């Protein structure tokens, strides 16, 4: 079994942060939609972590100005992105996907290479940047380029982006002891 992923990458781009989340060695990208007509991805590894690929979410922070400032608008914004992903996947819950280099160039291509998408419902080539507001796309492109400078090969031609993962948790860490209990608040066992 492979150990837990040891890297976390982050880059500040303007007023946003782009970061990797939940690196899964030997992992898969899986379907996580909970509503009809929406596509959502997530990543996971089985216990043995012996899958063909490794995967990590690449997340860009969303500001209140992106969605209009209140919780209802934030949820509507998320649902709109998920509906766009569903449509871009061609319906049937396939996910839109693109090679990383293609995303950086705005080309919208996906070719068969060393990295084979694991998404169980299938993938459809798509310009992922067209699914997001321009500010988010620009930040993701800048962040991925910075990640390549930090970790050579991160934007390798065969690397694949499968999306959209719209339901990440905040990058807050809750310290726990060896039994999983919070070290800050006794009697609380954070999970998730």
Each language-model region and where it sits:
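Residues forming the flavin
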Residues: 1-192
């Amino acid at each position: 079994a492979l150990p837990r992923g040891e890297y976390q990458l982050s880059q500040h781009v303007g007023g946003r942060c782009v970061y990797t989340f939940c690196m899964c060695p030997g992992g898969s990208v899986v379907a996580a939609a909970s509503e009809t007509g929406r596509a959502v991805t997530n990543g996971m590894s089985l216990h043995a972590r012996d899958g063909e690929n490794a995967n990590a979410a690449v997340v860009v922070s969303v500001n209140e100005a992106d969605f209009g400032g209140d919780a209802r608008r934030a949820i509507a914004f998320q649902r709109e992105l998920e509906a766009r992903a569903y449509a871009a996947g061609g319906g049937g819950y396939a996910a839109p996907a693109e090679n990383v280099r293609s995303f950086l160039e705005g080309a919208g291509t996906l070719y068969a290479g060393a990295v084979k998408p694991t998404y169980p419902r299938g993938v459809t080539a798509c310009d992922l940047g067209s699914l997001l507001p321009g500010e988010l796309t620009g930040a993701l492109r800048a962040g991925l380029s910075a990640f390549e400078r930090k970790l050579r090969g991160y934007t390798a031609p065969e690397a694949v982006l499968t999306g959209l993962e719209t339901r990440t948790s905040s990058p807050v860490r809750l310290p726990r002891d060896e039994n999983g209990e919070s070290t800050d608040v006794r009697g609380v066992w954070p999970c998730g």
